[in-house]
Amino acid sequence: MGISCSHLEETMSKPPDCLLRMLRGTPRQRVFTFFIISFKFMFLISILIYWHTVGAPKDQREYSLPVDFSCPQLAFPRVSAPGNIFFLETSDRTSPNFLFMCSVESAARAHPESQVVVLMKGLPRDTTAQPRNLGISLLSCFPNVWIRPLDLQELFEDTPLAAWYSEARHRWEPYQLPVLSDASRIALLWKFGGIYLDTDFIVLKNLLNLTNTLGIQSRYVLNGAFLAFERKHEFLALCLHDFVANYNGWIWGHQGPQLLTRVFKKWCSIQSLEKSHACRGVTALPPEAFYPIPWQNWKKYFEDISPEELTQLLNATYAVHVWNKKSQGTHLEATSKALLAQLHARYCPTTHRAMKMYL
């Protein structure tokens, strides 16, 4: 085609006068130049979206962890309640990190007589082919923790999300994993009822007295990182309908926090959120209940705090959301006085012991 900068890398690394000559060239040359620039731009955008969705690369030390863990002696009563506390892993990851372990352990310790069910999409149905890693080994120490495979097609079956999922699984979208997680938690609670928690929560108190409840993140938006609902509740049915009717997988949060906010405002016939609100049997608790530290201030979790200040900060908190999307990759010294380290030591001591041993 008579273009002197023929290869992609060469084209984008030439000085500006080369690019100017190409832009002044024949129509074919200009089309080719536009294609190269567009390709490089889209490639960069794809990388940024991936990092925004999945996060930065994990700490390499996690890949050298042992696969077995010596369980401590645990005095847990016999499980009497049905499986009503759920954690979901909708990616193919099957090796829980330390925050994931702490989330599940803290829930198990706060609810010793209830089943804490961890559903993981990457787990095979064949129980003889289960992965061996530190996270699975440690969580298996707790008699009330059940780790099971997650079949998304089966989960969405007989819900308004079935047709959506059959199409969505075959197309690319920038926020595919978060959207899938948003869909799964609503379908799960609609089908079975109970409590759902994100895997970056640390549970401080028993949550079983909370029914048909969610949390306010800020004055503008609710958050679905914690949800507690009865089986087949009408509010969840409206969420399922809105998920499909107003679907947009290209806007961050549109199918999650924004969806819950839209439905809640319609449910309560309100225009804006208050500090807390309850109507028609559904309660939105104030930010201090689950989001005592706003996401903008996530670094506070890694700052030192006195035990007295910690108690005062979390006095009205049921569970602490750590904003893993922002904080992942940040080094935490397990023996420090950092807020997060103190939470680990107090509410997930088994995970904390493993952190001190291996980090």
Curated annotation (Swiss-Prot):
It catalyses: a beta-D-Gal-(1->4)-beta-D-Glc-(1<->1)-Cer(d18:1(4E)) + UDP-alpha-D-galactose = a globoside Gb3Cer (d18:1(4E)) + UDP + H(+); a beta-D-Gal-(1<->1')-ceramide + UDP-alpha-D-galactose = alpha-D-Gal-(1->4)-beta-D-Gal-(1<->1')-Cer + UDP + H(+). GO terms for biological process: globoside biosynthetic process; plasma membrane organization. It is a single-pass type II membrane protein. The chain crosses the membrane at residues 31-51. Its main location: Golgi. It comes from the Eukaryota. The conserved DXD motif is involved in enzyme activity. Belongs to the glycosyltransferase 32 family. This is Lactosylceramide 4-alpha-galactosyltransferase. The lineage of its organism: Eukaryota, Metazoa, Chordata, Craniata, Vertebrata.
